[in-house]
A protein has these predicted regions:
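Juxtamembrane C-terminal module of membrane proteins
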Residues: 1-34, 57-90, 116-124, 305, ...
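Juxtamembrane "helix exit" motif at the C-terminal ends of alpha-helical transmembrane segments
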Residues: 33, 39-50, 323-345
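Short, acidic, metal-binding catalytic loop of nucleotide-sugar glycosyltransferases
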Residues: 84-87, 97, 105-117
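Acidic donor-binding segment of Leloir-type glycosyltransferases
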Residues: 108-141
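Long helical/loop segments within the catalytic core of UDP-sugar-dependent glycosyltransferases
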Residues: 137-153, 157-161, 177-246, 286, ...
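Short beta-strand-to-loop acidic/aromatic patch adjacent to the donor-nucleotide binding site
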Residues: 159-174
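Acidic donor-binding loop at a coil-to-helix junction in glycosyltransferase catalytic cores
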Residues: 247-253
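Catalytic donor-sugar/metal-binding loop of nucleotide-sugar-dependent glycosyltransferases
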Residues: 255-274
């Protein structure tokens, strides 16, 4: 088509297509690319979810398999050693900051045969029946907090006895009549309820898991130690010492003994059980668990490659164990998202079953009433979650300093009257 001036004019629809066509095509191309990319991302979500859930359940399964091996085979037939050393051969050292009334109750509970009694404190206090030593502010060493107090005592106190019995400020010695013959003697614990029922149930749950301690004397390296009730041959304590920065002094000491090529670790678990206080609040318990796992991870370098791997797997399984109850229901609500779904369901249910097993074993260890046992079993998902939250926090954001788990006044703690028998 031409105009009066002789110029050619394009049809209107042709002009419209030529002026907007390229931009429309570009827009459609970009939209198609975005949709394709979104589809690819969405397609990978089930794979990532499946891989994550399988990783968690396999970590838990490996940890449970090793625990089962320890309890069913290594600890099988273990007999608690009989005492061979009189209590007159023992020097007691209580570690505290400033909990005078709590320490006094613990000192009062000591057997009369133990006469060499010392309290290592951060603040001045008066304790009847024991000599109090205050760690000077000017004392410097690599160790911090409790470890610093232990190291000061090692350097400045004289011990003429065969054994040093280390106790926490709230450790109540209830049935001690002697010390078995070993370089390191681990006593068992029985936390008493203080303010919180949930933290108490979490302690019962934890002690159900810790029946594995019966296997520790057969291992090259005990997997952990409890410093609230541990007797160490004085000569060994003076040789190894406590001068190292750590948040788990007791476990680090035992691992250091095992790592010392000049020492053949002689470790045993005694029958005697000492009462302690369960953490008074959930927050205190979470902080406590966080220090345990962070300290364990930090000190793995003392272990051989095998035990380092075992410790890491167990710590990871503990930290991610809050997800275990969820694992059992994911396939039901989100079917088809997990590879090998039937195998996953079977394994996740088996893992959760062991969580119940630890609750039952804890009730048996404590000799608790039927009502408390039923309450713990019913509340096991919540209790195991609270028990592990601190481990998860300590693994993700390790604490950088040691914080003391505060104790409550003795009158707020359940009575310790009980009969102790073997488990």
């Amino acid at each position: 088509m031409t105009t009066g001036d002789g110029k050619r004019r394009e049809p209107a629809e042709s002009l419209g297509r030529s002026s907007t066509g390229p931009s429309q095509q570009h827009l459609m191309s970009r939209l198609a690319s975005v949709l394709t990319m979104e589809g690819q991302v969405l397609a990978t979500v089930p794979a990532i979810l499946s891989m994550t859930l399988w990783t968690i359940v396999l970590l838990s399964a490996c940890s449970i398999a090793y625990w089962t091996y320890l309890v069913a085979f290594v600890a099988r037939g273990y007999e608690y050693p009989e005492p061979e050393h009189d209590l007159a051969d023992v020097q007691v050292r209580f570690l505290t900051v400033e909990a005078e009334h709590i320490v006094q109750e613990s000192v009062n509970a000591l057997p009369e045969a133990i006469t060499d009694r010392h309290v290592i404190a951060e603040q001045p206090m008066e304790i009847g029946g024991a000599t109090v030593h205050v760690v000077p502010e000017a004392f410097e060493c690599a160790a911090i907090r409790k470890g610093r107090a232990l190291e000061w005592a090692r350097q400045n106190l004289t011990c003429e006895q065969e054994y040093l019995l280390f106790l926490d400020e709230d450790s109540i010695v209830t049935d001690l009549d002697g010390i078995p013959d070993a370089d390191v003697v681990q006593f068992r614990e029985r936390p008493r309820r203080s303010r919180s029922w949930l933290t108490y149930l979490a302690e019962v749950f934890r002690l159900g898991f810790q029946v594995e301690q019966r296997a520790f004397p057969s291992l090259t390296v005990p997997l952990y130690a409890w410093g609230g009730g541990i007797a160490i041959r004085a000569e060994l304590e003076d040789r190894i010492g406590w001068d190292r920065k750590t948040m788990i002094e007791d476990t680090t000491f035992v691992w250091s003994v095992a790592a010392d090529e000049g020492v053949d670790l002689d470790f045993t678990l005694a029958r005697a059980t000492f009462d302690t206080q369960a953490p008074p609040t959930i927050r205190a318990m979470i902080g406590q668990r966080g220090r345990w796992i962070a300290g364990s991870q930090a000190e793995r370098g003392l272990l051989s490659r095998l035990y380092r791997t075992l410790t890491t797997v167990r710590n990871l399984a503990w930290a991610f164990s809050p997800a275990v109850p969820v694992l059992t229901v994911v396939p039901l609500f989100v079917p088809g998202t997990i590879a090998f779904e039937l195998a996953f369901q079977v394994l996740s249910v088996a893992v959760f079953a062991f969580v119940i097993v630890w609750s039952v074993l804890g009730v048996r260890y404590y000799g608790e009433s039927l009502s408390v046992g039923v309450a713990l079993v019913v509340l096991t998902p919540i209790v195991s979650l609270l028990h592990s939250l601190g481990a998860f926090a300590g693994l993700v954001a390790p604490p950088t300093d040691f914080a003391v788990t505060r104790k409550v006044e003795p009158e707020l703690v359940e009575t310790a009257d009980r009969e102790v028998d073997g488990d």
